[in-house]
Amino acid sequence: MKNIRKACVEAIFREFENECDAIRPAAGDGWDEIEARRSLGHIVGCIDLDVTDLVDIVVDTINKEL
């Protein structure tokens, strides 16, 4: 289970790093105002989360890990 959890966290951070739709600035093109703090497991800033896309990322990652 620990490996699946780690894989899901990594997948979400990759989504952020690729500037995809699941995690994006709440206003305009403010990517520079959002910070990924991997060591803490946080993405910090004024963001807009697409929960459906995040769930898809997690489910897809779990399916790959099983």
What residues fall within each predicted segment?
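Protein-protein interaction and targeting regions used for scaffolding, dimerization, and localization
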Residues: 1-66
